């Protein structure tokens, strides 16, 4: 990886440990960073390695997954959020008022953009196929599920899961602007000791709820699922 591969949005272990003009990371390190730690830099590097967004979307279609599409990497999505799409550089003379207006435009543009979208049903369908071994080879399936079991955001669905039930999940979060959070998501596979499995896809969009209420909502979703759908 080169320094210009770094994505300056979100939390990135890769960025934090990067020194000099280039660093070498294994595919396993990038996968762990992207899946378990939601590292945007790692996600973009992996996306480019497999052939870019069209390759990923084609893979989904080839495996019968509709209404899920990947059009851009995290860097491009961050530029849209920041109102920088089409801009090569920000003006050094930008005023606080101009910056606020730019961010507002970017946030509104992201919410209206049809690209890089999925539905809860499509996300659940993806997880079902993954769980059933219909997407990847057996070793790759085991690896991805293990990375999902070790994702590091504890206060969404995982907060409502009792001892003995395992959760392999992936969270997604946008930043918050003026009290609105564009995306606050968690999708996962719950598994009981006897093998009983339930798939959950929970998406919260354009929410004005404070962070503690959003986290409490996802905890409650998991509690209801466990209570009503246990074996």
What is each residue range found by the language model?
Residues 1-76, 80-82:
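Active-site-adjacent loops and short helices of periplasmic peptidoglycan-processing enzymes
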Residues 5-6, 17-18, 31-32, 94-96, ...:
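Short, flexible segments with low predicted structural confidence
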Residues 28-32, 47, 57, 104, ...:
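Generic detector of well-ordered alpha-helical segments enriched in charged/polar residues
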């Amino acid at each position: 990886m080169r320094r210009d591969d770094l994505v300056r949005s979100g939390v990135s272990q890769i960025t934090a440990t990067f020194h000099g003009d280039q660093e070498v990371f294994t595919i396993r390190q990038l996968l762990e960073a992207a899946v378990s730690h939601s590292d945007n830099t790692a996600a973009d590097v992996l996306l480019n390695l497999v052939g870019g967004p069209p390759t990923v979307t084609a893979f989904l279609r080839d495996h019968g997954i509709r209404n899920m599409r990947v059009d851009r990497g995290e860097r491009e999505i961050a530029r849209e959020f920041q109102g920088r799409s089409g801009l090569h550089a920000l003006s050094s003379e930008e005023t606080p008022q101009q910056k606020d207006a730019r961010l507002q435009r970017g946030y509104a543009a992201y919410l209206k953009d049809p690209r890089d979208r999925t539905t809860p049903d499509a996300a659940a369908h993806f997880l079902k196929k993954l769980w059933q071994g219909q997407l990847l080879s057996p070793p790759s399936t085991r690896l991805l599920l293990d990375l999902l079991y070790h994702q590091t955001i504890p206060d969404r669905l995982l907060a409502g899961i009792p001892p003995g039930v395992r959760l392999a999940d992936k969270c997604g979060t946008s930043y918050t602007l003026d009290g609105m959070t564009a995306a606050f998501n968690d999708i996962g596979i719950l598994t009981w000791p006897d093998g009983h499995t339930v798939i959950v896809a929970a998406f919260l969009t354009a929410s004005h709820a404070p962070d503690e209420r959003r986290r409490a909502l996802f905890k409650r979703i998991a509690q209801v699922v466990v209570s009503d759908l246990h074996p």
